[in-house]
Amino acid sequence: MLLYLVLGLATALIGLVLFWYVQVQNVEIGRYTVIEADGDIEVRQYPAVVVAEITQTGSRDQAVRSGFGPLARYIFAKEREGEKIAMTAPVTQKAVASAWTIQFVMPSGYDLERLPKPTDPHVRLRQLPPTRRAAIRFSGWWTDDLFRLKDAALIGWMAKKGLTPVGTPTFAYYNDPFTPGFLRRNEILYDLAP
């Protein structure tokens, strides 16, 4: 009897992992071209993209949690007429003065004219210009300690390469909060001076 219970639980777990994997594979990932790669660090060229964004106050963790809801309601047409917009990855977050701006990149094929207007006055649509960025990729839980460690590694690498970061870092989250830390894809990115 115990053997059947264990086999049943193992089968259910495998099913959940496969379901999660299929869901992750169906999410459009933001496009970029790798210019230079060194282990977990890359210099990338990003094309112009359209984002839906919101600015929230509080800690990094509080801001991304409170900012996610209004952006999700926008793309899933919960507070507006029209079609749903597919979720993409990553969700990004950047410190701006004493607040945080959280962004959802719109799927390729959308431009500012084609996107429905947000009904929430705090949600903004904006086109970002092409940009060159340095990025470090890592897995793990979204903790400030881990982010500080990886941020320091990226800053040190840029200094050795003679690259000048512009502004504050962007935190990029590729997975939902239910994904185990060891399976997560996280990144820290800096825009680079020309």
Residue ranges and their predicted role:
Residues 1-194:
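A solvent-exposed interaction/effector surface
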